[in-house]
Amino acid sequence: MSHNPIRPWRNIERRKSRQVRVGNLMVGGDAPIAVQTMTNTPTEDAAATIAQILRCAEAGADIVRVSCPTEESTKAMREIVKASPVPLVADIHFHYKRGIEAADAGAACLRINPGNIGSHARVKEVVAAARANGCSMRIGVNGGSLERHLLEKYGEPCPDAMVESALDHARILDDLGFYDYKISVKASDMFLTVAAYHALAEATDAPLHLGITEAGGLRTGTVKSSIGMGALLWAGIGDTIRVSLSAEPEEEVKVGFEMLKSLGLRTRGVNIVACPSCARQGFDVIRTVETLEKRLAHISEPISLSIIGCVVNGPGEASLTDLGFTGGGKESGKMFVNGRADHNVANADMVEHIVKLVEDKAARLKAQRDAEEATEVPAE
């Protein structure tokens, strides 16, 4: 739950779901909402895939999905799994044997698509491999690849068809005594996706993986995903997310975290509050923010920073952030620390000064967190 006793209108009551394990990560229940992305390198090229996974992990990815379309790709998974610092989900379509091979290779989770995985007997074999290797599974329904009998029944992809597909396959896993699974019901149609997830959330306690599939490029995909997934997250629905963009996977991770940060569901990195700028600005706000976003991208500790061009809203915004800079002086501005006006800084020195303040604060926060973790008593 995102709980704010002072501002209760910001509270989000998360849907109660059961927990499943994805490698060393717990998903569902009261676990943090996990941010996922997917590699786009040929999986057979282990070196390129590992390099991309490492970049995604550096950006903050909790889970990375890897497509396994060929026997060569599942062979490469052994090397990839060993080198990955985060749990890997093997993406399986059409060829159920790839799921068995991926489980044997060390994948933490198997994603299967009910629309193309095949018969009950094939699913049973995949489940046996998952159980034997400690894998969880994801039932990944997609509006673009629904089973033929459901399309004939409903006429087109619709919420009822997607939920029926998901629950039919959930029952197969339940009947096999396998409960370590999460479910997704994605479509490129935002309205269809949101409606399907709301219906699914009422019908199961399985963790739900959110996404608007084939959302588009960096700008359009971010907007569409933020509206659709943001509405679901605000309603308390969702245990893992993936922002599907026609962009590098690291960008998906960044957008995913910004979405969660905006809703108060996760905190990571610097949250910059900035004005759009106008004629009153005392410095170039747009260029300054662009520079700071790049210079502070390596910070993982949660820090809020306001960059406001003038004194109309600057002091008020700065009073709500850890650090803040407000323009208004002659080629200078006021630096706020912990919500209070602290000192003046020349515009020419502002970026370097802010970067140092943020890095120093991040170092203190990390040292404090490390000390707290070192003194924690292990659970019996």
From Swiss-Prot:
Catalytic EC class: oxidoreductase
Cofactor note: Binds 1 [4Fe-4S] cluster.
Signal peptide: none
Pathway as given in its UniProt record: Isoprenoid biosynthesis; isopentenyl diphosphate biosynthesis via DXP pathway; isopentenyl diphosphate from 1-deoxy-D-xylulose 5-phosphate: step 5/6
Gene Ontology MF terms: 4 iron, 4 sulfur cluster binding; 4-hydroxy-3-methylbut-2-en-1-yl diphosphate synthase activity (ferredoxin); 4-hydroxy-3-methylbut-2-enyl-diphosphate synthase activity (flavodoxin); iron ion binding
Highest taxon of source: Bacteria
Gene3D superfamilies in the record: Dihydropteroate synthase-like, Sulfite Reductase Hemoprotein, domain 1
Cofactor: [4Fe-4S] cluster
Catalytic activity reported: (2E)-4-hydroxy-3-methylbut-2-enyl diphosphate + oxidized [flavodoxin] + H2O + 2 H(+) = 2-C-methyl-D-erythritol 2,4-cyclic diphosphate + reduced [flavodoxin]
Gene Ontology BP, a term: terpenoid biosynthetic process
InterPro entries per UniProt: Dihydropteroate_synth-like_sf, IspG_bac, IspG_bac-typ, NO2/SO3_Rdtase_4Fe4S_sf
NCBIfam families from the UniProt entry: ispG_gcpE (TIGR00612), PRK00366.1 (NF001540)
PANTHER family membership: 4-HYDROXY-3-METHYLBUT-2-EN-1-YL DIPHOSPHATE SYNTHASE (PTHR30454), 4-HYDROXY-3-METHYLBUT-2-EN-1-YL DIPHOSPHATE SYNTHASE (FERREDOXIN), CHLOROPLASTIC (PTHR30454:SF0)
Family: Belongs to the IspG family.
Entry protein name: 4-hydroxy-3-methylbut-2-en-1-yl diphosphate synthase (flavodoxin)
Organism: Hyphomonas neptunium (strain ATCC 15444)
The organism's taxonomic lineage, starting at the top: Bacteria, Pseudomonadati, Pseudomonadota, Alphaproteobacteria, Hyphomonadales
